[in-house]
Amino acid sequence: MDRVPREEFVPEDVRPDAYYDTPLPIGHNQTISAPSMVAIMCQALDIREGNKVLEIGTGLGYHAAVMAVLAGASGVVYTVERIPELADMARSVLSRLGFDNVKVFLRDGTEGLPDFAPYDRISVAAAAPDVPQPLVDQLKDPGRLVIPVGRYFQQLMLVEKKGGQIITTDKGGVAFVPLLGKYGFKGY
């Protein structure tokens, strides 16, 4: 994480707070996750050199950049954002900082990104009512998916696909913005 300058991924007015361990507003009623939460999610995912990673909820691209460092030059991070302005800003920041192995897409993240599936790892940075089936379907076997689940009281769930079986582990309570879309919350 020390190779990713968090202050570059937040609006100018909150840059003085960039290194506090707290979520920060990035506009459009969205936030950048606290550094400790990014670390917890990355640790649960166990991203390896060469992994193909899907992220749902790009925001301004900070978490994608951290995962790109973990995946290394031979890995790739595909990240999906539903808000055009955030996707555009993320593309700009990631490009300026040289994160060439991160590809930003504008679409409904609850449907995943089947074009490049299957993925070794999937990270979801917004809370869903349940784990969206398209994401499980796009997960490689073996593979890992981490997602916050719940409306008011959320749990960070690690979903592992191993030998055709799905194993789910509760990693603890969290607080995320809602995941909106076909397989997420509607009209939140």
UniProtKB/Swiss-Prot annotation:
Domain of life assignment: Archaea
Compartments it resides in: Cytoplasm
Keyword match Methyltransferase: yes
Keyword Methyltransferase appears in the UniProt entry: yes
Entry keywords, A to Z: Cytoplasm, Methyltransferase, S-adenosyl-L-methionine, Transferase
Catalyzed reaction equations: [protein]-L-isoaspartate + S-adenosyl-L-methionine = [protein]-L-isoaspartate alpha-methyl ester + S-adenosyl-L-homocysteine
Pfam families: PCMT
Family: Belongs to the methyltransferase superfamily. L-isoaspartyl/D-aspartyl protein methyltransferase family.
Role description: Catalyzes the methyl esterification of L-isoaspartyl residues in peptides and proteins that result from spontaneous decomposition of normal L-aspartyl and L-asparaginyl residues. It plays a role in the repair and/or degradation of damaged proteins.
Protein name: Protein-L-isoaspartate O-methyltransferase
Provenance organism: Methanocella arvoryzae (strain DSM 22066 / NBRC 105507 / MRE50)
Designated gene of the protein: pcm
